[in-house]
Structures are given as structure tokens and as C-alpha cells.
Regions:
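Glycosyltransferase catalytic domains, chiefly GT-A lineage
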Residues: 1-135
Length: 135
């Protein structure tokens, strides 16, 4: 990452997204997902939204924290074996350092209720997963 932010800047709870590459469909999915989270958020202070991306300019003016990722970082996160989904685990590892509670959100997630409710289900002994996927 090219930007370092401490926990007090992000806040106690965050939704964390990872977006990279040039496929417009993923960028549009991320925007729709973020908009759905913002639409259903009842209290502004309940959580923040953090996006790690190599396309920070696509989110200029959005009410989220955008952390710019370099090609070098994305390459390191992919690892020597070239496994692109390893980047997700690396983003989560980096992201959990930014807030008290972090929930990683895939770009194709759409919220129909206040995402703040999810943080009540996350504890030191309890994690949250929407769907286990093998890929």
C-alpha cells in the first residue's frame, strides 16, 4: 500500500473492499455494493468503508477511505506462485490493522439492511462468513 493510516483515523468498525485490475464490471459492482451499504447505514458513526485499490481515481469524491495499491504491492500480494486470490488474504491481513473490527466485503455484495448489524456478530471468538467458496 502506498498510504499508511492508523486505527484512530479509520474508526472502530470498517467494511473493507479490495478492487484491482481493469475489468469495469468489478468496479461497477464495488460502487453498487458501497452505495447499498451507504443507503442502509442508519448512523454515520457506526462504521467506515475502506477500499484498497489500484484505481483510486475512480472513487474520487466518494465518502469512503481509499487506499491506493501499487503494482508492486499487488505483485507481492499475489506471491511467487501467481495465485491472484492470495491478494484477498493479504488485504484482510493489512486491513484488520486499521480498525477494531473489520468485515471484508466482496464487490458483488448488495446490502438490504444496515451493515452495522453485522458487527454485533463479530467477536474475538466468532467470525462471520456469508458463503464458503472453493475456487
Amino acid at each position: 500500500m502506498t498510504q499508511h493510516i492508523n486505527r484512530s483515523v479509520i474508526g472502530p468498525h470498517q467494511l473493507l473492499y479490495l478492487l484491482y485490475g481493469d475489468k469495469e464490471v468489478y468496479r461497477l459492482e464495488a460502487k453498487f455494493s458501497i452505495l447499498s451499504a451507504l443507503r442502509h447505514r442508519k448512523n454515520l458513526a457506526d462504521f467506515t468503508i475502506t477500499l484498497m485499490t489500484d484505481q483510486p481515481e475512480a472513487f474520487d469524491g466518494w465518502p469512503i477511505t481509499v487506499l491506493s495499491l501499487s503494482e508492486e504491492t499487488l505483485g507481492i500480494w499475489q506471491g511467487a506462485g501467481g495465485y491472484s486470490h492470495r491478494r484477498k488474504a493479504c488485504a484482510i491481513q493489512a486491513g484488520v490493522m486499521l480498525a477494531g473490527k473489520t468485515i471484508f466485503i466482496d464487490t458483488d455484495t448488495v446490502f438490504f439492511k444496515d451493515p452495522a448489524l453485522l458487527f454485533q456478530r463479530v467477536t474475538d471468538d466468532q467470525f462471520l462468513m456469508d458463503e464458503f467458496e472453493l475456487s
